[in-house]
């Protein structure tokens, strides 16, 4: 691992390249990027609006903005694999273990992981098994 933190402008450039219809806000004073896009994990899937909040050098936080609230599987009380049920903050990796290092591109890691999470979520809705 190189431990080289990728600048926000580079992260944003790649995100905008892959997702030209996305929206973003970048605050250079706080080194924070807020980025929104719509993901559809499969051709049969619903479309989900996600928001990624990334402060330079920290782990990105990923939220499902829409639909909100996300439906629950029959008999379930809470969403599985989330850090925050109400905010719908997805658990894509274990942040305290630094499983996502800041020398990785968000577009190549976090976004595909979020799409995969959404696909597993849809399977969970039908089967009740994550």
Predicted segments, located by residue:
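Structural preference for beta-rich elements and adjacent junctions enriched in aromatics
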Residues: 4-8, 35, 41, 121-124
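Compact alpha/beta protein-protein interaction domains typified by the UBC
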Residues: 23-96, 104-105
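Generic N-terminal initiation segments characterized by hydrophobic and/or small/turn-forming residues
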Residues: 5, 9-12, 76, 87-89, ...
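Charge-rich, low-complexity N-terminal segments
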Residues: 1-34
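Ampiphathic alpha-helical segments that act as solvent-exposed interaction surfaces
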Residues: 88-130
